[in-house]
Amino acid sequence: MNSATSLMCFALLLISPLCMGYTAEDREADSRRVAEIIKNSQDDNSKINSIQELLDIYKRLYPSLTPEERESIDNFVNEHTDEVLVDGVPSQGGRKTKFAGKILSEATKGVATGFFEELGSKLAGLFTG
C-alpha cells in the first residue's frame, strides 16, 4: 500500500508539468488577442493603455520562444521599461512600462505609441512564423 502511494505521487510529479504548459490553444488565443489589440487601438491613449496587456502576453509566450527571439524582444522591452522594486527586490508584478498611468506630453506619447507598435509587430511576427 505504501509503495503504491509513493508510485502514484511520483507519477503525478512527472505528469503535472506537462499539464501546465503553454498549449496550442493558448497560443492561438493569444495570437487572436494580439491581432485584436492592434486592430482596436486606433488612438494614442488606447495604444498606451494596451501596452501592459501586450507585455503580459509576451510573458506567457516567453517559455516557448527560442533564445534568439527572447533576447531580441527582451532587449527591446528592457529599453522601455522600469523594474519595479519593493524593498530592493522585484515585486511580483515585475516590470512596468515607463508610460502607463502617467500624464504624457506629446513627445512621450509618440515614444509610447512607437513602443506599442513595435512590440505589437514583434509579437504578431512570432505568431505568424
Curated annotation (Swiss-Prot):
Residues 1-21 form the signal peptide. A humoral factor that may play a role in stress tolerance. GO terms for cellular component: extracellular space. GO terms for biological process: cellular response to heat; innate immune response; response to bacterium; response to heat; response to UV. This is Protein Turandot B2. Keywords: Immunity, Innate immunity, Secreted, Signal. It is found in: Secreted. Belongs to the Turandot family. InterPro entries: Turandot. The lineage of its organism: Eukaryota, Metazoa, Ecdysozoa, Arthropoda, Hexapoda. It comes from Drosophila erecta.
